[in-house]
Amino acid sequence: MEQAGTRPAATEHPRLRRPMPWLLLLPLLLLLLLLLPGPAASQLRYSVPEEQAPGALVGNVARALGLELRRLGPGCLRINHLGAPSPRYLELDLTSGALFVNERIDREALCEQRPRCLLSLEVLAHNPVAVSAVEVEILDINDNSPRFPRPNYQLQVSESVAPGARFHIESAQDPDVGANSVQTYELSPSEHFELDLKPLQENSKVLELVLRKGLDREQAALHHLVLTAVDGGIPARSGTAQISVRVLDTNDNSPAFDQSTYRVQLREDSPPGTLVVKLNASDPDEGSNGELRYSLSSYTSDRERQLFSIDASTGEVRVIGGLDYEEASSYQIYVQATDRGPVPMAGHCKVLVDIVDVNDNAPEVVLTDLYSPVPENATPNTIVAVLSVNDQDSGPNRKVSLGLEATLPFRLNGFGNSYTLVVSGPLDRERVAVYNITVTATDGGIPQLTSLRTLKVEISDINDNPPSFLEDSYSIYIQENNLPGVLLCTVQATDPDEKENAEVTYSLLEREIQGLPVTSYVSINSASGSLYAVNSFDYEKFREFFVTVEAQDKGNPPLSSTGTANVYVVDMNDHAPHILYPSSTNSSAAFEMGPRTAPAGYLVTKVIAMDSDSGQNAWLFYHLAQTSDLDLFKVELHTGEIRTTRKMGDESGSTFNLTVVVRDNGEPSLSASVAITVAVVDRVSKILPDTQRHVKSPRTYSEITLYLIIALSTVSFIFLLTIIILSIIKCYRYTAYGTACCGGFCGVRERSPAELYKQANNNIDARIPHGLKVQPHFIEVRGNGSLTKTYCYKACLTAGSGSDTFMFYNTGAQTGPGPSGAQAAVTDSRNLTGQSGQNAGNLIILKNEAVSQNEPRQPNPDWRYSASLRAGMHSSVHLEEAGILRAGPGGPDQQWPTVSSATPEPEAGEVSPPVGAGVNSNSWTFKYGPGNPKQSGPGELPDKFIIPGSPAIISIRQEPANSQIDKSDFITFGKKEETKKKKKKKKGNKTQEKKEKGNSTTDNSDQ
């Protein structure tokens, strides 16, 4: 670049221009070499048969071109495939210059049907440069057999085809060319067919099968031929095809009867349907050409046609009308048998019928028209059928009358020899769907002849019946926790209609169950009526519901009806028992306490449990699963009460651990358990509450426990409020009458014994021990001046009282003279002293010396005893207004308080308490008359009763002395005595004694 741009180098220019003429001559020399003839450019031709194995030699290109490969050197030759055939069928050996087969050559695949198959190559040589064209011709060999397009050919040729008819056959194909292609065809020997070959084009021929003799299906119905194609190769190859020629029948034979004339005899009285003769004809053709149909030919007169008929398929000729010898003694019947070919062919015969004379022509009923079915809502006079009658006799015997059964809803209307059958009454398809109406035809001859004709009249349906369920209601019982989609029940409704009027579809009427549509619970298959559960049912949420199923038909208009399916959810044992009391947590057991002096059978506590299930699944059974002392405690199976089996002694431990299992009666059974710690102490008051047991986190309370706490708190508040209100009212009333009672404290009205004695009417005799101090917890006994046998008492109790027994000595009327034989009732020491060990200071003993000694007293029906009330009373007595307080003459050791209502003598003797009765010196006891107390005999009821105390009015009513049943001997609770006292108050007794009695009664009623 630098030299090209420097001009001063002019001295070197002559040396640069010297080689230029030689460079210009080189292209000219190369062009000259290419144009010169000789080994530089040549044309080579080779041929090789197809299907040669790879490596087969085609020719030596180097030798043909006169090239010496040793002088040229390696890589001086190269071959190119013109047209780039793929794959490369030929290759050149660069070391030897030989052209050989590289891959198998299939001429048919490479060149198909072309006459010549050539492969064009180009050989390039270097030093010197030479280009040679090479043509390799692929020679065909006979490697393919001729082949027909189909292996079998089916030809159908009618037997009526004339000889010379041609039938084209497809030619065979051979992929080879030239002499190796198909050259000739051969046909198997046949007397009916031959092969005709016509050239179409080079190496192609047209094949035709030529009929050279007529066909007869009756002789040969099928012909089998073999067509063979042969090529010109060596050895020759061939291919075959099967040709089946089926000969089609033509109606070329006419039917033929066994006889041309048949002769028979027939009685005149032959009824319709009598077989006259059975004809037989035959036809050698096949198919429809051989099927025969019998009929009366046109030569048969109408008279014969009315009397005789022939069965088209069997050829039986039968009588259809009445034969009359007087009219015709013989009949000629012409019968033809016709085949069913395209061009029917017929055969004929004649039947001669000779009538044997008898005189008995019966009328004939002919059904002209029948309009069946008849709709069930057809109106009267609707035409059902049109009938006609015929009698071959003459004169009076020809007159025919028709009749029906009177019970049918049809009647006949006649005009001449024709009758119409019409509707005369209501039709009901559901009751009768088809009527077989028998029409009786009677002629006027002597004797009368009759004939019957039965008409089958069908009644068509209309939609006049709604679907009806098989049951008014369906009861479905399904266990809870069912799987969704379970089949509940299949309801079924029937419709007496038919077809679409009887097709019933089912659906559920819309309604809500617990705020949700019914389809949220139940689904129904509209076609089958099967009810399925959509969801799982829970017995504890709802136990039963009902769905209304509507069944509707598909009539026009549609009719429907409804049915009810009651679904009852059956409880399963899916809830374990829940222990309400006592409750325990995982960290601590329930705590209970009991005194060490508790006897056998002592109630320690009671396990309360509940089960959300029902029925036997909710039956609970209590078991003692574990305890530290197996012999000390037992659990009641059904109540859950835990009691001691023996007395707790000093040898027992201080605490006992128990585990109580509550099990239900389900299958399988579920259970719950609670742990209980029982502490044994000397006194219950010393036991401190377990704060861990009673103080719980609010989260541990269940919803049920919360409801129980609210309910108990509400009840306790109402009860406390009621007690306060009653106490205020009572204090107000006592204050009004001079008696103080405040804040739940019951006091005694301060009166001296002398004052009380002055106001008494000597009906009550009461004695109190010396130095007895009246306590605020008292029993009040009142007596009335006017009603000396009516008393009331009041018991004011404290929470510390442990006695639950009250002894009351009843009074009775005097039944006879002499001293009373009444005695005190005997109670055991436990009843008198109570289980808490207190003395029997709560016992008041009433005495009446006028007690009947003859018979025991029956309980008054007015008495009602409440077991929930206890009369734990201390030894204090308040005798108000009608009582007498006085000391007995016996001194302190024998000063037993006595209450008497019948004996006015204060000097009567006193009886000490019975030995072993558990009554100490500070107790009240009965006062008896002189003498020892009388013991009750076996089976007798004592006149004295021990009755638990109750804050209610106790009335002792005295009946007259001659009364058989002394009702005053018993205690009465209720309002009868109060009603009597109110009536007496209305009578106007205004004395202070009656006022005080009325006030006392009102006070007791408030209690």
UniProtKB/Swiss-Prot annotation:
What ranges are annotated Cytoplasmic (topological domains)? Answer: 730-1007
Q: Where are the PXXP repeats?
A: 856-859, 889-892, 930-933, 948-951
Which BP terms does GO give this entry?
A: cell adhesion; homophilic cell adhesion via plasma membrane adhesion molecules; nervous system development
Q: What residues form the membrane-spanning segments?
A: 709-729
Question: From start to end residue, where is composition biased (Basic and acidic residues)?
Answer: 966-980
Q: How does it sit in the membrane?
A: Single-pass type I membrane protein
In which broad location class does this protein mainly occur, judging by the first location in its UniProt entry?
Answer: membrane
Provide the residues annotated with a glycan attachment (glycosylation): 280, 436, 586, 657
Its cellular-component GO annotations read: plasma membrane
Enumerate the Extracellular topological stretches: 43-708
Q: Name one Pfam family in it.
A: Cadherin
Cadherin domain boundaries: 43-148, 149-257, 258-365, 374-469, 470-579, 594-691
According to its UniProt record, where is this protein located?
Cell membrane
Give the span(s) annotated as 4 X 4 AA repeats of P-X-X-P.
Answer: 856-951
Which interval of the chain is the signal sequence? 1-42
Q: Which UniProt keywords apply?
A: Calcium, Cell adhesion, Cell membrane, Glycoprotein, Membrane, Repeat, Signal, Transmembrane, Transmembrane helix
For this protein, the record's CDD domains field holds: Cadherin_repeat
| Sequence segments annotated as region (Disordered) | 885-1007
Q: Which Gene3D superfamilies match?
A: Cadherins
Molecular function (GO) terms for this protein are:
calcium ion binding
Q: What does this protein do?
A: Potential calcium-dependent cell-adhesion protein. May be involved in the establishment and maintenance of specific neuronal connections in the brain.
PANTHER family documented for this protein = CADHERIN-87A (PTHR24028), PROTOCADHERIN ALPHA-C2 (PTHR24028:SF119)
Protein name, as recorded: Protocadherin alpha-C2
Q: Which organism is it from?
A: Pan troglodytes (Chimpanzee)
